[in-house]
Amino acid sequence: MDTSELERRAKICLSVVTFSTSYSLDAGVVVLAFLGIQRFRRSSKGAKIPEFLWVTWQSFIKVLSLLNGFVQHQKRYIFIRVCIY
């Protein structure tokens, strides 16, 4: 996977995570992780990112987006409950 593809995916992930302002800290973590991967690529002279690292990165993003979705869902649920009662 080339750098441009990785950057594109990272931007998509960042936009998903930063969609909720309550997860700005997680967005920071994503940026740090992305910069870490970029640094690894530079230090290994453009070597391919190990598969396990890429899978871990994707899992990390999935967990963040699931958490984010869950929190948003809970907020909506509480809001609806408050409106009804």
From Swiss-Prot:
The chain crosses the membrane at residues 12-34, 49-71. It is found in: Cell membrane. This is Uncharacterized protein AF_1482. It comes from the Archaea. It is a multi-pass membrane protein. Its main location: membrane. Keywords: Cell membrane, Membrane, Transmembrane, Transmembrane helix. GO terms for cellular component: plasma membrane.
